Amino acid sequence: MILSIESSCDDSSLALTRIEDAKLIAHFKISQEKHHSSYGGVVPELASRLHAENLPLLLERIKISLNKDFSKLKAIAITNQPGLSVTLIEGLMMAKALSLSLNLPLILEDHLRGHVYSLFINEKKTCMPLSVLLVSGGHSLILEARNYEDIKIMATSLDDSFGESFDKVSKMLNLGYPGGPVIEKLALDYAHKNEPLMFPIPLKNSLNLAFSFSGLKNAVRLEIEKNAPNLNEITKQKIGYHFQSVAIEHLIQQTKRYFKTKRPKIFGIVGGASQNLVLRKAFENLCDEFDCKLVLAPLEFCSDNAAMIGRSSLEAYQKKHFVPLEKASISPRTLLKKALSE
C-alpha cells in the first residue's frame, strides 16, 4: 500500500491505497473550515498550526487501519506543490520522517495532477487521454491529460479563481466561509430564475481562452453597495442567484470555445467547487451538445483529499519516480506546463 498525505491548504488528510488494484483502503480527513470562517478565508499561519495538530491525529488512525503493521507500506506520497508554503511544509516534514524511519521511498505529487486522478479513485484503469476542468478556491483551469507525465494547462484564470470569487461574494454578503455551498443554497431559494441576468458575462467578446472573475466580483460589490440600506434576504438571494448564474455561464462559454477547437471525446470536472450541482448540470448539457462523455469526481473527493494523491502516486510508484530525502522540497506553484498557445 501507499500512504499518502495532503496538506496544501486547509484540509489535513491521510489515505491508504492498495497498489495491486488501486482500491482505497482508508481515508481520513480533518477540515479547518470552522476555524477560518470568521476570517472569510484561509489564514495561512492558522492553517499551518492546525495541520501540525491534526496530521499526527490522522496518523494514529492510519496505524489502527494497518494494525500497526507498517510492513504493508511500500511508499510514502506527499503533495509538495502547489499550495501554501507554510502548510505544504507540515505535510512534507511528516512524509520525510516516515520515509526515513520506515526506510520507504518518497513520492512527490503535484496537487493539480492529484485532482485529475480524483476521477479514478478505486479504479485501476484511467480513461486518459481526456480534458479536465478544475475549479476550486485556488484554481480555474482547463487541463489536457494525455497520461501521468503529460498534463498541460490549456486555460487559466487571469485573476480570481471560480471558488475564490464565491468566497469573496459570500463575505460581501456577510454569509460566511466557505462561500460555495452558501451561495448555491441562496441561489436555489431565489424565486425568479427566468429573469435576465443582471451582471455582464466576463470575457464574452474576448478571443483569449481564459477565465476572469474580478470584474464580476466588482459588479456584485457595486450592486451590494447600491442596495446597502435595504439588503434583505430576497435581495441577497437575487444577487447570489445572478452571480452564480453568470459565473457558471462564463465557465460554459469559455469551455465551449475550447470544445470547438479541440473536440475532446472525454471531459472531466474536478476540484472543490465542482460539487456545485448547477455547474454539474450545465456541463452535462454542454457535453451532450458536443457528444462528449462527461466524467465527474465523486462529491466526497472533490475538495482536497489524500485519496486522490494516493491514486495519482500509484502511477509514480510503477515508474519508480522516487525522490531522495535531501532533494524533497515544496513549491507554492505548479510545475505543470502551460500550453496556452496550442
Curated annotation (Swiss-Prot):
It catalyses: L-threonylcarbamoyladenylate + adenosine(37) in tRNA = N(6)-L-threonylcarbamoyladenosine(37) in tRNA + AMP + H(+). It is an enzyme of class 2 (transferase). Its EC number is 2.3.1.234. Its cofactor is Fe(2+). Keywords: Acyltransferase, Cytoplasm, Iron, Metal-binding, Transferase, tRNA processing. It is found in: Cytoplasm. One of its GO terms (molecular function) is iron ion binding. SUPFAM superfamilies: Actin-like ATPase domain. Substrate binds at residues 134-138, 167, 180, 276. GO terms for biological process: tRNA threonylcarbamoyladenosine modification. One of its GO terms (cellular component) is cytoplasm. The keyword Metal-binding applies. Binds 1 Fe(2+) ion per subunit. Its main location: cytoplasm. Fe cation binds at residues 111, 115, 304. PANTHER family: TRNA N6-ADENOSINE THREONYLCARBAMOYLTRANSFERASE, TRNA N6-ADENOSINE THREONYLCARBAMOYLTRANSFERASE, MITOCHONDRIAL. Required for the formation of a threonylcarbamoyl group on adenosine at position 37 (t(6)A37) in tRNAs that read codons beginning with adenine. Is involved in the transfer of the threonylcarbamoyl moiety of threonylcarbamoyl-AMP (TC-AMP) to the N6 group of A37, together with TsaE and TsaB. TsaD likely plays a direct catalytic role in this reaction. HAMAP family: TsaD. Belongs to the KAE1 / TsaD family. This is tRNA N6-adenosine threonylcarbamoyltransferase. It comes from Helicobacter acinonychis (strain Sheeba).
